[in-house]
Amino acid sequence: MVLFHSQASCSKRVKADAIVLPFWKVKSKPKCAASIAKEYESLYRVALDSFSGERGEVEFIYNSGQGKEKRLLILGLGKNEELTSQDVLEVYAKVTRTLRKAKCTTVNVVLPTISELRIPVEDFLTNLTSGILSLNYNYPKYTKEAKKTDPLLTKVTVLGIVPKIADRIFRKEESIFEGVYLTRDLVNGNADEVTPEKLANIAKGLAKQFPSVDAKVLNKDAILKEKMGLLAAVAKGSAVDPRFIVLSYQGKPKSKDHTVLIGKGVTFDSGGLDLKPGKAMLTMKEDMAGAATVLGILSGVAALELPVNVTALIPATENAIDAASYKMGDVYVGMSGLSVEIGSTDAEGRLILADAITYALKYCKPTRIIDFATLTGAMVVSLGEDVAGFFSNNDVLAQDLFEASAETSESLWRLPLVEKYDKALHSDIADMKNIGSNRAGAITAALFLKRFLEDQPVAWAHLDIAGTAYREKDEDAYPKYASGFGVRCLIYYIEKFLSK
């Protein structure tokens, strides 16, 4: 994907469907933030009577002949001294939404005068690029009118910046968003198509695409041979066999530092015998968003050729309902040897993650483990769709993730591992139950996973993306439905804190 181009001189720009001109909000009237103003001043002068320059304000002006573009879009950036990187991300996402609705496919984007920017030009350009890329995406439609979807942008030329600075940022963000789009496509896909086998094939495809990536897939028999009794239990009710996927990237083979990413891969969650209500089941094709996220992250890391070692583990299965389904009140033993009494078959995600954690400890020699899962409704209630909660046993890892979230505007919030609540997992007949009480559900789910670390000195973080992985509205910097949340944050984290 090569969407972005740059041109230092505005006068040498190529023809396009539209040009985006930025404005600052000042006391008297909006001030054009770029030197190209004189060329279009006669066009936008009248529009300024009703245009304030507020952040995110946009207005189209049709060009009757002058200039190289059919339309001028004036964009408010708000007050210069108040503009943040997240603001840049969101306003250029809005620009993309506006351009696409107007059927524009080629666009010239004028940068504000660099010397006037209060934030580093690299940050501005990165977030401009990310905002445009995030909304330059179509989720799948199956109607006869699918072809009437707003067209994608095919060429974006950023004016006022030399290619030496811009092109490196463009290529990097395009590579990252290939991973974001992969994540979104998988989460948005039909559950009958995005099966455990499909996830395995995607992993194999990445291994073919990148020489430094290897894929290994365990089928049902291999899962049973490894004594992954918790993953096998969840899979019992499905006509589709489970898979356990191991995808390894070796960017620094001589280093012992090793990051293991684990993604929950429940490709459809009916709740099992503890059947979900129909409305709650409606979006459960997205219950494999954790798996899709780690595939997207690994794709981006490999594309950027980062000097790190990363392995993605994906326990993949449906949680379906059948006469053979695993049953509440029964006890199943995981790969760790720990036994679990099933308090709810709808708390299946933590079961398959537990076997993946054990696999990581046994075979991967991890320095750190980071898992992603659409795990609890409690997290959605707590933090909504804009913030993902996370838990960690390591303050350094937690702080680094928090910083990465701030830099990428993918908000994380650390929640406590309240040890007192661990007793809610007590079972009289097994080592533990898979659910706690009806309170602090996100915390007790994290405490359940923490037990499978078995006190080994491994840094660990658990990201509950139940609220952020899938959105019901097209707003801010995200399209409707699958968001791809977490891919950008983790790639930033890996690049900044681990690429040494």
Curated annotation (Swiss-Prot):
<feature type="active site">
    <location>
        <position position="276"/>
    </location>
</feature>
<feature type="binding site">
    <location>
        <position position="348"/>
    </location>
    <ligand>
        <name>Mn(2+) 2</name>
    </ligand>
</feature>
<keyword id="KW-0378">Hydrolase</keyword>
<dbReference type="GO" id="GO:0005737">
    <property type="term" value="C:cytoplasm"/>
</dbReference>
<keyword id="KW-0963">Cytoplasm</keyword>
<dbReference type="GO" id="GO:0070006">
    <property type="term" value="F:metalloaminopeptidase activity"/>
</dbReference>
<feature type="binding site">
    <location>
        <position position="346"/>
    </location>
    <ligand>
        <name>Mn(2+) 1</name>
    </ligand>
</feature>
<comment type="similarity">
    <text>Belongs to the peptidase M17 family.</text>
</comment>
<keyword id="KW-0479">Metal-binding</keyword>
<dbReference type="InterPro" id="IPR008283">
    <property type="entry name" value="Peptidase_M17_N"/>
</dbReference>
<feature type="binding site">
    <location>
        <position position="269"/>
    </location>
    <ligand>
        <name>Mn(2+) 1</name>
    </ligand>
</feature>
<keyword id="KW-0645">Protease</keyword>
<feature type="binding site">
    <location>
        <position position="348"/>
    </location>
    <ligand>
        <name>Mn(2+) 1</name>
    </ligand>
</feature>
<dbReference type="GO" id="GO:0030145">
    <property type="term" value="F:manganese ion binding"/>
</dbReference>
<dbReference type="InterPro" id="IPR000819">
    <property type="entry name" value="Peptidase_M17_C"/>
</dbReference>
<dbReference type="GO" id="GO:0006508">
    <property type="term" value="P:proteolysis"/>
</dbReference>
<feature type="binding site">
    <location>
        <position position="269"/>
    </location>
    <ligand>
        <name>Mn(2+) 2</name>
    </ligand>
</feature>
<keyword id="KW-0464">Manganese</keyword>
<dbReference type="InterPro" id="IPR023042">
    <property type="entry name" value="Peptidase_M17_leu_NH2_pept"/>
</dbReference>
<feature type="binding site">
    <location>
        <position position="264"/>
    </location>
    <ligand>
        <name>Mn(2+) 2</name>
    </ligand>
</feature>
<dbReference type="InterPro" id="IPR011356">
    <property type="entry name" value="Leucine_aapep/pepB"/>
</dbReference>
<feature type="active site">
    <location>
        <position position="350"/>
    </location>
</feature>
<protein>
    <recommendedName>
        <fullName>Probable cytosol aminopeptidase</fullName>
        <ecNumber>3.4.11.1</ecNumber>
        <ecNumber>3.4.11.10</ecNumber>
    </recommendedName>
</protein>
<keyword id="KW-0031">Aminopeptidase</keyword>
<dbReference type="Pfam" id="PF00883">
    <property type="entry name" value="Peptidase_M17"/>
</dbReference>
<comment type="function">
    <text>Presumably involved in the processing and regular turnover of intracellular proteins. Catalyzes the removal of unsubstituted N-terminal amino acids from various peptides.</text>
</comment>
<dbReference type="InterPro" id="IPR043472">
    <property type="entry name" value="Macro_dom-like"/>
</dbReference>
<dbReference type="Pfam" id="PF02789">
    <property type="entry name" value="Peptidase_M17_N"/>
</dbReference>
<feature type="binding site">
    <location>
        <position position="287"/>
    </location>
    <ligand>
        <name>Mn(2+) 2</name>
    </ligand>
</feature>
